[in-house]
Amino acid sequence: PIIGCEVYVAARTRFDKDADKDKQSNHLVLLAETQEGYKNLVKIVSKSHTEGFYYKPRVDKDLLREHSTGIIALSACLAGKVQSLLLVGDYDGARREAEGYREIFGDQNFFLELQDQGLEEEARVNPLLVKLGKETGIPLVATNDVHYVNKEDAKAHDVLLCIQTASRVDDENRMRFPNDEFYLKSQEAVSYTHL
């Protein structure tokens, strides 16, 4: 099995708790490559809860650096820091962020993550990720932002979101996913053909 998780990376450090500066965090996917990587993943997740909890469990780059051995990291979805910077037009900042993660995890253990759930933002970001990968030599990986197993589970997932957020299904202003493409897709369905 592939064991991993998506973590929240604190805006500053995992110890900072200023509502104006630290409520926002970015996603990062961590996968255990080895037994040592699994142990490091457990340490990272444990410390995110015991040391970094502020609205949600958070990690920071010092914690990642301290426990990076045996871990593969992916830049995550649109909520990843690299993608977030690209969305606001900060290509140089995205490049620095990606190179920083490569420095933490190693040349072949950090990947830029391409996703295509049919979102307009992905259509804008993906070509920039490809460009960034070519310029930096950081490898690319095509994935899907999986929140449920099968496409037909989208409605059940929507109901669970309503329960989680104390909303009604008929509330037009509630949190919802934009479409039903957030399921576990086959390798063929995920293949990114725009390289």
Question: Model segments located where?
Answer:
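Phosphodiester-processing cores and adjacent nucleic acid-binding clamps
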Residues: 1-195
